[in-house]
Amino acid sequence: MSTIFSKIISGEIPAHKVAETSEFLAFLDINPLKRGHVLVIPKKEIDYLFDVEDELYAGLMIFAKIVAKALKKAIPCKKVGVAVIGLEVPHAHIHLIPMDEVSDLDFSKPKLKLTEQELSETALKILNAFKD
């Protein structure tokens, strides 16, 4: 089964990537709750996060932590929230969301509609935060 995330990994579908290793990828959510909303995924296609084997799961969490630190530098916020929903795309993924209040993690709220330029600028800010 080839998910939209697998197509992003292969380059078939473009994405605003902010971090990548041989096993993991982080990219901007195109329907974000807040500017800087990042999705972190294993490159191995596994539907449910808690079905990911332990070593890969631990690596994913460490990768998410690294991305979250850069995200917090790039997008001023009190904290970077973490959410696992997994109902829309059958590929394990973690949401990293800049937050200043609990309601920033409310997935029932309308999503932002950012332009391609706004997404590119946000991705660049996060990429540059890795260099600091």
Predicted regions and their residues:
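HIT superfamily nucleotide-processing domains
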Residues: 1-132
